[in-house]
């Protein structure tokens, strides 16, 4: 990758590594549905003017049905389930489970029998990265609730299917228009729930977490991610998931006092090695979004 590619990649790793901590902080006071509303509404408000300037309103409305389906599968359901799960499991474990997404994507590729050749080198890289993440967190499934882990696997499924919808039905619609329409629809869906479950008081800490989560980690992240896709392609962009996890673990340990395991010392180098191997593929594939 070029220097610009690495810069964008690093920025994405940080920006998409932060949300796990922010969600964990926000759900202490906010209902998960309220958090989804507060995360999507500002993005829609910020992106809609860009859609108008681009002249993409007609394209967005023409494919309203598929944008709605994409939004529900990629944002509406996963973000609610993730926020619910983070009330019961650590941000580190959450980020680890999200790393199943690239592996799910490979499985879906094989099931769909796409023409793209998945090289042994790339499969090895994804495998090494997954093992590294497991060492990073020192995962013990017996120590966590199977219910919340199951919810996170559903999140991973949504994050896998969403990009497939994007690739099959929405490639002709500008990315910003898709995100603007999808977040607007999800915000409207969760609006009644948000009104009913709105808390009587929201602390400044919670507002700060929500603001960063929505404006920086969602709106800002998508703008950077679109540039990253242009620079390095969708295949290499997938690997940002592993770096997200490394950063999420560090933030969980420092900011939330989550357990610091010896596996971090072993796991982080494995994540880096796995990422290098996995980025060696150059052919395109459906973009994987894991914000």
Name each model-derived stretch.
Residues 1-37, 72, 80, 84, ...:
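Glycine-/small-residue-enriched transmembrane alpha-helix faces in small-molecule transporters
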Residues 1-6, 28-37, 59-65, 138-161, ...:
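Juxtamembrane helix-entry segments on the extracytoplasmic side of multipass membrane proteins
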Residues 15, 19-20, 48-98, 131-135, ...:
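Specific transmembrane alpha-helical segments of multi-pass solute transporters/efflux pumps
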Residues 29-77, 100-109, 158-162, 179-197, ...:
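Transmembrane alpha-helices of multi-pass small-molecule transport proteins
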Residues 34-45, 73-74, 79-116, 120, ...:
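Specific alpha-helical transmembrane segments that line the substrate/conduction pathway
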Residues 37-38, 75, 94-100, 163-187, ...:
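Helix-helix packing/entry segments at the starts of transmembrane helices
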Residues 47, 105-107, 111, 129, ...:
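Transmembrane alpha-helical segments that form core, pore/gating elements
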Residues 47, 68, 99-100, 108, ...:
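Hydrophobic transmembrane alpha-helices of multi-pass small-molecule transport proteins
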